[in-house]
Each structure stands twice: as structure tokens, then as C-alpha cells.
């Protein structure tokens, strides 16, 4: 497994990078199996909901295992593009241009990149990632909430992501992505919660570019 070289002096930075790179399933999410027929039908709904998103903006709150929290705005454009714009004072950026996910640290002038397919975010961004094939419905006890753990058993090094979908008639496919959870190889659990979803908004491709801090120390405006 490739280890990220993000500065270890800031545990939050390590957690943010790890959660978006390689992750392992959380044992706390293990639950009794859902009947196959129910699995298939609900997973079809999840796939339709995720694929129904063309563009989306939402506010996010990202919390690591120690309870450290950062906030910002997420911008998504299918296929494959996403941007996590962190709040002022957090000199980091996570962006995918449709091919690779980049973790940009403006504090230490570093950029880490890895293919979308090697990231748990591939469940959201990679059209080749078959959520129905690799997803497993995890019981929640709430008929309005679906929890789906997505991982490729043949490639455990690619990690896993657990998506939490909430029934919402106003969302594509009637399901809204409320949050996701990742647990990295260093046992650092990260939770991302979304709010204030806006669908079908105009998003330029330029939103998924960034100024490389290795060439310039200035953060993009």
C-alpha cells in the first residue's frame, strides 16, 4: 500500500488524506445480512439515485476519529469530478478532474494524486465502479435510511466506503446522499456529512482545476 507523505505534524491533515485515499471497512458496521431480493431492489435504487446526479453542490462537515472537524463546500459534476473547498483557515483542497483525485496541501506545498479507482470516492465518481456488484446493504433499523458498504473483495487495498442515503422525494431517484464513512489503514475513521444539497446547478469545468503549490505558494481564489 502506498503511504501518503502528508506532514505528520498535523494529525487532521493525515486523517483527511487517508480518508480519501485507501480505507478499510469499519468492523462496527458489520450487521446481519439483508435478504438477497431486498438487497437487489434497494441497490438498484441507490445506483439510480447516484447516477441521476448530474451536478450538485452541498455544504459538508468532515470529522475525524478524534472529533476534529472542518467544514466547507462540496461541488460535484458527473462523470468523475468533485471539489472539496475547505473553510477559510484550512489551507487544503481535495479535487478530482475526472481521472485522478488530488490532495493539495498549501501549508507544506505538497500535492498527492491517485487514480479515482483506487479511492473509496470511486463509488461516487467512477462510472466503472459497479455499486450494485460491489455494494452490500447494511441494516439501519430506519425504513427511510439506506446504508451501503461498497468494496471490491478482489482488491481490498482499494478500500471501502459506506454511503448513507436518506429518502427524499426532491432528490434524484428519491434518495439523497446524506453522509459517508471511511476507516483508513491507520484505524483513523472519518465521517463526511452533507447538508443544503443543490441539484442541477451550473458548474464550470474550471472548478476542478487548482494552482499547484509546488510552483506557486498562492492559494487559488
Show which residues each predicted segment covers.
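Bacterial N-terminal signal peptides that target proteins for export
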Residues: 3-26
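Sec/Tat signal peptide C-region and signal peptidase I cleavage site
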Residues: 29-38
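Cleaved targeting-peptide boundary
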Residues: 37-45
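A short, Trp-centered hydrophobic/proline-enriched beta-strand micro-motif
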Residues: 48-67
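A generic structural motif
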Residues: 61-63, 85-87, 104-106, 151-153, ...
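An acidic-aromatic
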Residues: 71-125, 190
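Gly/Pro-enriched, hydrophobic low-complexity segments
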Residues: 133-134, 139-220
